[in-house]
């Protein structure tokens, strides 16, 4: 909230003061009253509004002037109607009265100035002049909320640059400028005003490394933008001419919200009195604009696809052809990372997660680069980040990482309402251990802190450490649905698979085999149903999935009708530490690629009944009534045998939400 310095009156000599248009400036009448005086009267020139907060006047004189008692509850404020054309051109006279003394007068000379710091606090995409008396220092959420928004300038307009745009202190061109939030300082003063007064723009020292402010000088060339605030520079003295003047600034974020940074950055303009060189500068007026750094937002499977990413490796040519056909149907771009750039690391989903950031004036896709740093480690930096495509990461020591820090373990739900609480951008889903032990694995706390700090997609922690790889995309997915809910949650289900196989066995199909057409030992339905060890292992897996089912129903507000069980069997295998973890027994169909109504599902190689794979037919029977098209893709030798499937080997850039994140209430 804008604040002016208290004006103290002095009966023995005139007082000179500055009042800013639109701000009520306190006038200390009682503290300066001579001893023995009990009431006062006040008059002002036409350009000054006087407001006395008190009970009714004690006495009204024949001239119409009022008198007020000098009580402790007394409050007097002054407001000027307009900026002064010359110094001291407005006057206020205070008259003190006592029962046994002659009246004493104090004279205050007022200089009115216009001074406002304006930003897009109404979130329209344009800077409007600051409204007098409107608080710009408080940032509020919701459809009626106010407060400016700031983007982290994390793209790279110059492809030849070594880093992101915010990593230097230059503005490259107008495109770079569009990633920043404009701010304007407007002043109107007497011509000689700044001979005795100084304006200073500042940011709290604790936040100067989170923001950079450029001042625009004449012209529009990049060299005409000078750094005013930023790392190592928390204040900036403005040298301004008197009269009416406008100064433009451009503000860029340097850091995303995180555990140690809530995302709020106040920028403050201070007016200082430097008229007496023998005294320190005195604070006359102060106003602030608070920016919030836009959060990084994930996009769920229900958002329309725009681009699919995949790796070319030595033996996945047929997989790539199938994927090309699918992306063509879905009308989205296919980007293939060549072998020499991925170094046999085909796990595109694990390497990165593509989301976006948004301000009223700009939306920017941003890739979140996982800390796993394997063969694909350079792909997000060299092939994804670029002009109008941002980048963020959290660097961690390799010794601190587990498989749960890869981004197959990072998903997001569609929008949900939970016990009356709306999550219009969905909720982030991450996998952790169900309980702590010396062998348990969790997503690194630094990653969890970053995701939680974004505020708009409150994370839900699931139990995934029971899996060999340990990722949530191994047992869940979401698909769009043409109904009020708008989606279905898909969960892998050993129970559903056993029920299907038992039904087929009862129909006389017990000798039908899995893995037909593969160089792999075939197993009949009868053999699978009679394998007690496999049944026991899948009973354990089912208990783990059921635990997550309950969490998802509670935290996403789902009913059983919102969930589809996808038949799937698992087997247990020892990991590097000798602990038993679950792997997919046949290609894991829930680990699918969702491109609108087109689904790329791992081909399960289930038993063939009447010329059709019974597992494929079962999945079609659940998904095609929703208007979805199922394409089963053979990923057996290129992905499945390495503990991954179609989703693990691909990544998708999706269309941002139409819902504006600042309209929600976290």
Curated annotation (Swiss-Prot):
**What phenotype is described for loss of this gene?**
Mice survive to adulthood and do not display detectable physical abnormality. However, mice were born at a rate lower than predicted by the Mendelian ratio and display defects in innate immune response. Impaired formation of neutrophil extracellular traps (NETs). Mice are more susceptible to bacterial infection: neutrophils cannot form NETs after stimulation with chemokines or incubation with bacteria, and are deficient in bacterial killing by NETs. Less than 10% of deficient mice produce a thrombus 48 hours after inferior vena cava stenosis whereas 90% of wild-type mice do.
Q: Sites of the modification Citrulline?
A: 212, 218, 372, 374, 383
Activity regulation note: Strongly Inhibited by F-amidine and N-alpha-benzoyl-N5-(2-chloro-1-iminoethyl)-L-ornithine amide (Cl-amidine). These inhibitors are however not specific to PADI4 and also inhibit other members of the family.
Return the GO cellular component terms, semicolon-separated.
cytoplasm; nucleus; protein-containing complex
* Record: residues binding Ca(2+) 4: 349, 353, 407, 410-411
Presence of the UniProt keyword Glycoprotein in the record: no
UniProt-listed GO biological process terms = chromatin organization; chromatin remodeling; innate immune response; nucleosome assembly; post-translational protein modification; stem cell population maintenance
Where is Ca(2+) 2 annotated to bind? 155, 179
Record-annotated residues binding Ca(2+) 1? Answer: 153, 155, 165, 176, 179
Biological role: Catalyzes the citrullination/deimination of arginine residues of proteins such as histones, thereby playing a key role in histone code and regulation of stem cell maintenance. Citrullinates histone H1 at 'Arg-54' (to form H1R54ci), histone H3 at 'Arg-2', 'Arg-8', 'Arg-17' and/or 'Arg-26' (to form H3R2ci, H3R8ci, H3R17ci, H3R26ci, respectively) and histone H4 at 'Arg-3' (to form H4R3ci).
Protein family (similarity comment): Belongs to the protein arginine deiminase family.
- What is the official name of this protein in its record? Protein-arginine deiminase type-4
| Species the sequence originates in | Mus musculus
């Amino acid at each position: 909230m804008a604040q002016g310095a208290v004006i103290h009156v002095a009966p023995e000599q005139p007082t000179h003061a500055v009042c800013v248009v639109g701000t009520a400036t306190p006038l200390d009448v009682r503290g300066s009253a001579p001893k023995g005086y009990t009431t006062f009267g006040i008059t002002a020139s036409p350009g000054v509004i006087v407001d006395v907060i008190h009970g009714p006047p004690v006495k009204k004189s024949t001239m119409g002037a009022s008198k007020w008692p000098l009580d402790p509850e007394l409050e007097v404020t002054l407001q000027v109607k307009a900026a002064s054309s010359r110094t001291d051109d407005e006057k206020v006279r205070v008259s003190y009265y006592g029962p046994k003394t002659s009246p004493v007068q104090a004279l205050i000379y007022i200089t009115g100035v216009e001074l406002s710091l304006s930003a897009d606090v109404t979130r329209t995409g344009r800077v409007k002049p600051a409204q007098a008396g409107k608080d710009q220092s408080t940032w509020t959420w919701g459809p009626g909320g106010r407060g400016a928004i700031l983007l982290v300038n994390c793209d790279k307009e110059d492809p030849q640059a070594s880093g992101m745009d915010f990593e230097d202190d230059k503005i490259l061109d107008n495109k770079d400028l569009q990633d920043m939030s404009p701010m304007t300082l407007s002043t109107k003063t007497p011509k000689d005003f700044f001979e005795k007064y100084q304006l200073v723009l500042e940011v709290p020292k604790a936040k100067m490394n989170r923001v950079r402010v450029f001042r625009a000088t004449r012209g529009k060339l990049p060299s005409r933008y000078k750094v005013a605030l930023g790392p190592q520079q928390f204040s900036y003295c403005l040298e301004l001419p008197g009269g009416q003047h406008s100064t433009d600034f451009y503000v860029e974020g340097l850091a995303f919200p995180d555990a140690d940074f809530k995302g709020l950055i106040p920028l403050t303009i201070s007016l200082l009195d430097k008229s007496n060189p023998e005294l320190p500068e005195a604070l006359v007026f102060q106003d602030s604009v608070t920016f919030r750094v836009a959060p990084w937002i994930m996009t769920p499977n229900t958002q329309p696809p725009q681009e699919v990413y995949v790796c070319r490796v030595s033996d996945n040519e047929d997989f790539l052809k199938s994927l090309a056909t699918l992306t063509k149907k879905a009308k989205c771009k296919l980007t293939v990372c060549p072998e020499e750039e991925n170094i046999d690391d085909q796990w595109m989903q694990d390497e990165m997660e593509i989301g976006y950031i948004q301000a009223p004036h700009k939306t920017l896709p941003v890739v979140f680069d996982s800390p796993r740093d394997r063969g694909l480690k350079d792909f997000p930096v060299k092939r994804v980040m670029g002009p109008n495509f941002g980048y963020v990461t959290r660097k961690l020591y390799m010794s601190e990482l587990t498989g749960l820090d890869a981004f197959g373990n990072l998903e997001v739900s569609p929008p949900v309402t939970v016990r009356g609480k709306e999550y219009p951008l969905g909720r982030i889903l991450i996998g952790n251990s169900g309980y702590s032990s010396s062998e348990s694995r969790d997503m690194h706390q630094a990653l969890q802190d970053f995701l939680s700090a974004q505020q708009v997609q409150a994370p839900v922690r699931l139990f995934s450490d029971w899996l060999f790889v340990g990722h949530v995309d191994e047992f869940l997915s979401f698909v769009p649905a043409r109904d009020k809910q708008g989606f279905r949650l898909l969960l892998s289900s050993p129970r559903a698979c056993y029920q299907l196989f038992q039904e087929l066995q009862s129909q006389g199909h017990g000798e039908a085999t899995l893995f037909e057409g593969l160089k792999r030992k075939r197993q009949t339905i009868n053999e699978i149903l009679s394998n007690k060890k496999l049944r026991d292992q899948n009973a354990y897996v089912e208990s783990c999935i059921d635990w997550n089912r309950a969490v998802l129903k509670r935290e996403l507000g789902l009913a059983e009708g919102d969930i589809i069980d996808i038949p799937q069997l698992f087997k247990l295998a020892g990991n590097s530490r000798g602990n038993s973890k679950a792997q997919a027994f046949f290609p894991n169909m829930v680990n699918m690629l969702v491109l609108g109504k087109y689904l790329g599902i791992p081909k399960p190689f289930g038993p063939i009944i009447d010329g059709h794979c019974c597992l494929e037919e079962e999945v079609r029977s659940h998904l095609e009534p929703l208007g979805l098209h199922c394409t089963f893709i053979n990923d057996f030798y290129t992905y499945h045998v390495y503990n991954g499937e179609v989703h693990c080997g691909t990544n998708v850039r999706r269309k941002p939400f139409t819902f504006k994140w600042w309209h929600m209430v976290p």
